[in-house]
């Protein structure tokens, strides 16, 4: 009995075809590099020819495996080592001069290169994520590039952000400490935003930043000792980006106002002394460059939110007048300008219109504030004549009619007495 292993049959004369995927994978990074460099050199400055070469070559080279090498060469002309140094810089046969970093430093040329990346990524969709990672990596390498190379990368990034090839979150690399400390992040951001705005507009840029929650991080482009609105505004305005300066100031003001409102609500609920609230608000105004017009409206909102109002119309007016009489000295401190007084009158009008139980309270609140020196005769007359809002204007103008007539008569009497003297 034969106990040995039975030999398996052997096929002869049969050739096995290597799958395309396996064919691609046999390429080493150096072979891949040489093929791409040669293709770029042959295309020269003809970017249409380059785009065509990349399209065709993707069917035989493994772009998926060597995506970082591909993008390194297209942007820097060579494979890059960590930090941004060129691996093959000594061997000119392994480097191409036909890349983004060696292109002319103008928007039109860089936009043409951006179109090459657009076509490539549309053709090979799987490269999308790899390209995002490449740009994030290159941003971290900025220190290793020349100023001109940084500028071209900034312009390319701006154009690609504008056309949607890159998502805004890739910009988080710019918040790296070593880039921020040396001023590279802020300088890069200015050039990038200019290219982005040139493709779209400032509103598109600020909208994209908001959606990516990057609007709150813009100050982090600067070192800690310069992370304030004043420095940001000066830097970006001088760079010709006033739209972004205004945007940041608005965002910071909104954020500050929310925090201020929250703190005021807390202090009012604890019934803190008015003088302490005044000191706190003045400090916040100075620290955050808040204008009186913004603060007076905020105070009114906080005061009206601090009370559980009676649902009966005949009782709520008395309740409101008692509450507002107590806090009139607080409002008076922050209504020293005609514009602030007008803002307050409009806020009162809006509140009384939106809260039906207060419809009949409007004129009584205004008279109370007039007597407490919160609003002046001039502000009331201005509101009455042409500065009132549309909301419930007929009702409120009718309520104020007798008081306005009284003010006018008092003024006329005062003038006639002056003439007699």
Swiss-Prot record:
Gene3D superfamilies per the UniProt record, alphabetical: 1.25.40.180
Record domain W2: where: 250-417
Entry GO terms, CC: cytoplasm
Source superkingdom: Eukaryota
This protein's record includes keyword Cytoplasm: yes
Pfam families: HEAT_5MP1_2 (PF25504), W2 (PF02020)
GO biological process, one term: regulation of translational initiation
Region (Disordered): 1-24
Presence of the UniProt keyword Cytoplasm in the record: yes
Protein keywords: Cytoplasm, Translation regulation
Compartments where located: Cytoplasm
Entry-linked InterPro entries: ARM-type_fold, eIF5-mimic_regulator, W2_BZW1/2, W2_domain
Xref: SMART domains: eIF5C (SM00515)
Entry similarity comment: Belongs to the BZW family.
Function: Translation initiation regulator which may repress non-AUG initiated translation and repeat-associated non-AUG (RAN) initiated translation by acting as a competitive inhibitor of eukaryotic translation initiation factor 5 (EIF5) function.
Protein name (record): eIF5-mimic protein 1
């Amino acid at each position: 009995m034969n106990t040995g292993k039975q030999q398996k049959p052997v096929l002869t004369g049969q050739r096995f075809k290597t799958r395309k995927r396996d064919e691609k994978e046999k390429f080493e990074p150096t072979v891949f590099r040489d093929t791409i460099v040669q293709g770029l050199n042959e295309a020269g400055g003809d970017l249409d020819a380059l785009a065509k070469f990349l399209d065709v070559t993707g069917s035989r080279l493994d772009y998926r495996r060597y995506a970082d090498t591909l993008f390194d060469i297209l942007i820097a002309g060579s494979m890059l080592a960590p930090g941004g140094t060129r691996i093959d810089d000594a061997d000119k046969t392994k480097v191409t001069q036909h890349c983004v970093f060696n292109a002319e430093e103008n928007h039109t040329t860089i936009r043409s290169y951006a179109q090459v990346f657009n076509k490539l990524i549309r053709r090979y969709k799987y490269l999308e994520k790899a390209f995002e990672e490449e740009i994030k990596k290159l941003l971290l390498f900025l220190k290793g590039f020349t100023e001109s190379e940084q500028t071209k990368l900034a312009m390319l990034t701006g154009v690609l952000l504008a056309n949607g090839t890159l998502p805004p979150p890739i910009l988080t690399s710019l918040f790296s400490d070593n880039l921020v400390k040396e001023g590279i992040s802020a300088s890069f951001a200015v050039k990038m935003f200019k290219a982005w705005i040139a493709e779209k507009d400032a509103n598109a840029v600020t909208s994209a930043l908001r959606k990516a929650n990057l609007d709150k991080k813009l100050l982090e482009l600067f070192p800690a000792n310069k992370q304030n609105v004043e420095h940001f505004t000066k830097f970006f305005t001088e760079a010709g980006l006033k739209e972004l300066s205004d945007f940041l100031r608005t965002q910071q003001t909104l954020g500050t106002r929310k925090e201020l409102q929250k703190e005021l609500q807390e202090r009012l609920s604890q019934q803190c002394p008015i003088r302490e609230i005044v000191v706190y608000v003045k400090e916040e105004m100075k620290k955050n460059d808040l204008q009186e017009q913004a603060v007076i409206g905020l105070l009114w909102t906080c005061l009206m939110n601090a009370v559980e109002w009676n649902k009966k119309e005949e009782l709520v007016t008395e309740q409101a007048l008692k509450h507002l009489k107590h806090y009139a000295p607080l409002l008076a401190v922050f209504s020293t300008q005609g514009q602030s007084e007008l803002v307050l009158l409009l806020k009162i009008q809006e509140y009384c219109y939106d809260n039906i139980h207060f419809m009949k309270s409007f004129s009584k609140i205004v008279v109370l504030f007039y007597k407490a020196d919160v609003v002046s005769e001039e502000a009331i007359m201005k509101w009455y004549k042409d500065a009132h809002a549309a909301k419930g204007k007929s009702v409120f103008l009718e309520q104020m009619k007798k008081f306005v007539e009284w003010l006018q008569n008092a003024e006329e009497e005062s003038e006639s007495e002056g003439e007699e003297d």
